[in-house]
Curated annotation (Swiss-Prot):
Its EC number is 6.1.1.17. Its main location: cytoplasm. GO terms for cellular component: cytosol. This is Glutamate--tRNA ligase. It comes from Metamycoplasma arthritidis (strain 158L3-1) (Mycoplasma arthritidis). Monomer. The lineage of its organism: Bacteria, Bacillati, Mycoplasmatota, Mycoplasmoidales, Metamycoplasmataceae. The gene is gltX.
Length: 464
């Protein structure tokens, strides 16, 4: 019987959900759901000083907003798999550490941070390109070892075999192999008693029966270390896949310090982007469907997801493309959903026409709210210039002769066009500016109608 596919997203509660983390979570979610498997949310919260209050809830809430709902989490645990927060598993990690020490597969390393720095320095001077820990470097007396041991002034390192290749067939990149001599014995428990990332994540993945690990390429260097830990315990390792980085449009890796680009899901949520659009957009950051389709629903993406189509090249975060996605979804959003979000005091008929008109070009709810202000707080003074007042006079003359409806406003525009033989910008701009006091906007007849007859006539009378 085939094992159930189980993937996981395991962030640290150190801040808001970043675009990169959201993309990783999404691919893990799609991978699991495509195979009728389970997607697990787990928390790596042992770095107490960096943890942010509310960080866990923020991560889960933003994932839920996107439509990424885990099958298991700290809030929805499966008792079979134990705790879902690393901070609640310290005794378990310690027991596994003790087991490795007992078997001679790990040992106490008594180096102080200053002594390690000196070893680093000596290797650099000797031309060693990348630091390898040398367990024979530190020379201590028996009494000093005893003192440091009693004071718990030590870390625990995994003892690696010499000249051993750790290899895996990466889901994204194909075969990768790293030799143990290029790694060196590495720390699996820090001197503060907390396990390192590489150790805790192996224990967690093993205990939770994780079958596939999809994560960013920055973890490639961690994988051979994790394989060494799996081997030390005699456990089967999951299948690994390392996603390419996300860059800005200049090809530079996204930096959280770059304020020119919104990089946190919370920002898009607050501005009123369609979550389905962000879900769709993120799925195409490093993956393409076999039929090249771009607009795909949640269920379509699950059905079509194929890890073989994950990109081997970096993905550019194109904000213009994301805006386009959001506009496509905004057009399809039911008017009543938008009306509920914009808190308009106008009547139902007006609200429906307003939303139907303005959602055609809007990427966010915030944009629609801004446009609503044009009608709720209309400008009292025209601050724009027009080139041809004859167009305005002619338009108003035709408009006054009819009932004030969208169809008749459009008819007055068309009659002005025919009477004066003007078209395009020369026709529309004078009318738009004088009737709406705006230079840009949606379909002109509807934009004018939404202001109401009294205000439009008051504005145009000045030109008659």
């Amino acid at each position: 019987m085939n094992k159930t596919i189980r993937t996981r997203y395991a962030p640290s509660p150190t801040g808001y959900l970043h675009i990169g983390g959201a993309r990783t979570a999404l691919f893990c979610y799609l991978f699991a759901k495509h195979s009728n498997g389970d997607f697990i949310f787990r928390l790596e919260d042992t770095d107490v000083e960096r943890n942010v209050e509310g960080g866990e809830a923020s991560q889960l809430n933003n994932l839920a907003w996107l439509g990424i709902v885990p099958d298991e989490s700290p809030l929805k645990p499966n008792p079979k798999y134990g705790k879902y927060r690393q901070s609640e598993k310290l005794a378990i990690y310690q027991a596994y550490i003790d087991e490795l020490i007992k078997q001679g597969l790990a040992y106490k390393a008594y180096d102080s941070s200053e002594e390690l720095a000196k070893q680093h320095e000596e290797q650099e001077k000797a031309g060693v390109a990348s630091f390898r820990y040398d367990p024979t470097w530190l020379k201590l007396s028996e009494s000093e070892i005893k003192r440091r041991d009693e004071a718990k002034e030590y870390s625990i390192r995994l003892k690696l075999p010499k000249n051993k290749n750790y290899s895996w067939d990466d889901l994204v990149r194909g075969p990768i192999s790293v030799n143990s001599d290029d790694i060196g014995d590495f720390v699996i428990m820090k001197s503060d008693g907390y396990p390192t990332y590489n150790f805790a994540v192996v224990v967690d993945d093993h205990q939770m029966d994780i079958t596939h690990v999809l994560r960013g390429e920055e973890h490639i260097t961690n994988t051979p270390k994790q394989l060494a830990i799996y081997e030390a315990f005699g456990w089967d390792n999951p299948v690994f896949g390392h996603l390419t980085i996300i860059t800005n449009m200049e090809g530079k890796k996204l930096s959280k310090r770059d304020k020119s680009l919104k990089q946190f899901i919370e920002d898009y949520k607050n501005e009123g982007y369609c979550p389905e659009a962000i879900f769709n957009f993120l799925a195409l950051l490093g993956w393409t469907s076999g039929d090249k389709t771009e607009i795909m629903s949640h269920d379509e993406l699950i059905k079509k997801f194929d890890y073989n189509r994950l990109s081997k090249s970096p993905s550019k975060f194109d904000i213009v493309k994301m805006e386009w996605f959001s506009k496509q979804y905004m057009k399809k959003l039911p008017n009543e959903v938008i009306i509920e979000k914009i808190n308009s005091p106008k009547d139902a008929q007006w609200n429906n026409l307003f939303v139907e008109t303005y959602k055609q070009q809007a990427a966010t709810i915030s944009e629609i709210k801004e446009n609503l202000k044009i009608y709720l707080f209309p400008k009292e003074k025209l601050e724009l210039q027009i080139d041809n007042d004859l167009v305005v006079k002619t338009f108003f003359a035709h408009l006054k002769a009819k009932d004030f409806t969208i169809e008749n406003i459009q008819a007055a525009i068309d009659e002005t066009k025919n009477a004066l033989n003007v078209k395009g910008k020369d026709l529309f701009m004078p009318i738009r500016i004088t009737a709406t006091y705006e230079e840009h906007g949606p379909e002109l007849a509807k934009a004018i109608y939404l202001f109401g007859k009294d205000l439009v006539y008051k504005r145009l009378t000045k030109w008659s």
